[in-house]
């Protein structure tokens, strides 16, 4: 296996993610059966004899969570004419809840019922979830047939309550490399629990390429004629890969291995292309062969905790707080990002005339940017570059010139959704550097980082991911599992977790924490939040009580988690 190790070593780079902190001054749904056309959903009870129209209609919406055989379970609730005309593949709308209201003018044989709900998302082809925020209103005609109520007229498409989606679909990651080839990026897909061959379903999704949302930020190196032909002779079989070189084959094998492993499909894995092992001389691969690219290695990484108080950054360890020397101990730090692995820090200094400075955590610094306002800095993967937003609307990327070795800055083009205006108050890159999260006028958005040309960056496909928070968001941080931690000004529910695809936002325990939550951070084992009174911590495992951080009791400071 020595040769395999050499190949992976040539592709990888050191894992490095920074910690940061500040104190304020229309697609079709699928069961995703792929190669198993006979997959069946669980047994679904049909219409209850004698059911009233509203009860029958709710049964229809519950049955919509089972799309097998062209929504056969749902069709049992339709009249013959409605069954012929209904196209369930038009779109799958996900709503928070479905409310029913019978319209005036009902007769013994006909009822018109209006359905209403807040549309929170759509579930598209390939199991891709896209967040939405709009009102759904539609009319459904019920008719009595043979003394039983049935649906006689309804809009095309499917409406799912969010709880039904979560009960019957499970999110899995399909992995693609970032443009540098250094890190795997998860592309979240919702796959129906009734699928009988999860591995072949995932393979088909992998070959099909990244979702339209994520595609601008990742690479897909498979030839256009590539296809997955199934699992046979104990191996996953692909065709159309003959033009791929050895490095491309290893990259694809790495995607396959980690996709299957994190879907809890046990290895080792035999992967063949055009009748031969995908990677020459290694017909069977395990996660140990490509361990350098484990996309979840970060979840168990050892971190260092720092605090920011009164402009001074301190190291926090075993209840002891030690102020740093160098520029981070100068007393004028407003916000900071630290990478202990790369021995680099970036800080916004000065309140009246903010400057972005870069240097060793306990050394000297270089000023790289001045502006009226500068957001908390954030590092790309492996600390290859630094980002911050100047004056509320201009993302700036700072990197070291390969020719002069000087620090240079370039503006990043950012494409906001139509109608979205206001200052960007928070901006943070994900661990992979492929996603960006931001707060604009108290609302949380997420976008994809693009590379139009070498040295050039952009942020596109920006969507709001937590509309339930309204305009209350104040702070955010990426968690190790890829979700977002969001601090808010909401008195009852001050801190939230937001899923990476916007499919959900859930409040974290609020015991002993008081809004506003002006700073948040997260390590593999602990969540940190600065509320109205102090810096608090909560174990990432089940717990409901926030406690003060030893060494910082009664102190209102911000946590900085660094790797």
UniProtKB/Swiss-Prot annotation:
Residues covalently joined to lipid (S-diacylglycerol cysteine): 20
Protein name: Lipoprotein LpqB
Residues bearing a lipid moiety (N-palmitoyl cysteine): 20
Signal peptide: 1-19
InterPro entries named among the record's database cross-references: GerMN, Lipoprotein_LpqB, Lipoprotein_LpqB_C
GO cellular component terms, A-Z: plasma membrane
UniProt keyword list: Cell membrane, Lipoprotein, Membrane, Palmitate, Signal
HAMAP family referenced in this protein's UniProt entry, alphabetically: LpqB_lipoprot
Highest taxon of source: Bacteria
Disulfide links within the chain: none
Family: Belongs to the LpqB lipoprotein family.
Location relative to the cell: Cell membrane
Annotated membrane topology: Lipid-anchor
Pfam family, one: Gmad1
Matches recorded under PROSITE patterns: PROKAR_LIPOPROTEIN
């Amino acid at each position: 296996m020595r040769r395999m190790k050499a190949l992976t070593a040539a592709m990888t780079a050191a894992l490095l993610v920074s910690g940061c902190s500040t104190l304020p001054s229309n697609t079709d749904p699928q069961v995703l059966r792929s190669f198993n056309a006979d997959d069946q959903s669980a047994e679904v009870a049909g219409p209850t004899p004698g059911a009233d129209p509203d009860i029958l209609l709710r049964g229809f919406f519950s049955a919509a969570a089972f799309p097998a055989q062209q929504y056969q379970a749902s069709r049992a609730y339709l009249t013959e004419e409605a069954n012929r005309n209904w196209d369930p593949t038009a779109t799958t709308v996900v709503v928070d809840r479905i409310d029913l209201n019978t319209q005036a003018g009902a007769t013994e044989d006909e009822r018109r019922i209006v359905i209403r709900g807040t549309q929170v998302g759509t579930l598209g082809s390939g199991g891709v979830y896209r967040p939405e925020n709009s009102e759904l209103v539609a009319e459904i005609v019920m008719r009595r047939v043979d003394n039983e109520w049935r649906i006689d007229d309804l809009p095309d498409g499917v409406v799912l309550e969010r709880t039904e989606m979560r009960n019957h679909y499970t999110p899995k990651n399909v992995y693609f490399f970032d443009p540098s080839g250094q890190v795997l990026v998860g592309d979240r897909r919702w796959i129906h629990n009734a699928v009988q061959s999860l591995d072949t379903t995932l393979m088909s999704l992998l070959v099909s390429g990244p979702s339209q949302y994520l595609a601008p930020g990742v690479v897909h190196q498979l030839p256009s004629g590539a296809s997955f032909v199934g699992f046979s002779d104990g191996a996953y079989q692909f065709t159309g890969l003959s033009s791929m070189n050895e490095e491309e084959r290893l990259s694809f094998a790495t995607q396959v291995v980690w996709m299957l492993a994190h879907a809890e499909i046990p290895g080792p894995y035999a992967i063949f292309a055009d009748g031969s092992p995908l990677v020459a001389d290694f017909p069977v691969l395990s996660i140990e062969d490509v361990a350098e690219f484990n996309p979840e290695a970060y979840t168990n990484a050892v971190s260092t905790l720092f605090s920011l108080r009164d402009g001074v950054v301190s190291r926090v360890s075993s209840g002891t707080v030690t102020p740093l020397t160098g520029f981070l101990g100068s007393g004028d730090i407003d916000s900071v990002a630290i990478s202990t692995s790369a021995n680099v820090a970036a800080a916004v200094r000065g309140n009246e005339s903010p400057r972005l400075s870069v240097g060793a955590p306990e050394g000297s610094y270089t000023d790289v940017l001045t502006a009226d306002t500068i957001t908390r800095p954030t590092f790309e993967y492996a600390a290859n570059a630094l980002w911050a937003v100047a004056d509320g609307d201009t993302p700036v990327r700072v990197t070291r010139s390969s020719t002069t070795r000087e620090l240079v800055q370039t503006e990043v083009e950012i494409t906001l959704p139509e109608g979205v205006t206001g200052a960007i108050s928070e901006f943070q890159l994900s661990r992979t550097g492929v996603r960006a999260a931001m707060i604009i006028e108290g609302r949380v958005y997420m976008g994809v980082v693009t590379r139009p040309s070498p040295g050039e960056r952009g942020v596109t496909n920006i969507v709001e991911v937590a509309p339930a928070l309204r305009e209350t968001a104040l702070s955010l941080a990426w968690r190790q599992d890829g979700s977002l931690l969001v601090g808010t000004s909401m008195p009852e529910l001050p801190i939230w977790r937001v899923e990476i695809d916007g499919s959900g936002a859930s409040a974290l325990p609020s015991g002993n924490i008081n809004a506003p939550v002006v700073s948040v951070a997260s390590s593999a084992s602990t969540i940190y939040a600065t509320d109205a009174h102090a810096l608090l911590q909560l174990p990432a495992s089940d717990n409901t009580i926030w406690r003060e951080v030893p060494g910082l009791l009664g102190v209102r400071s911000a946590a900085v988690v660094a790797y």
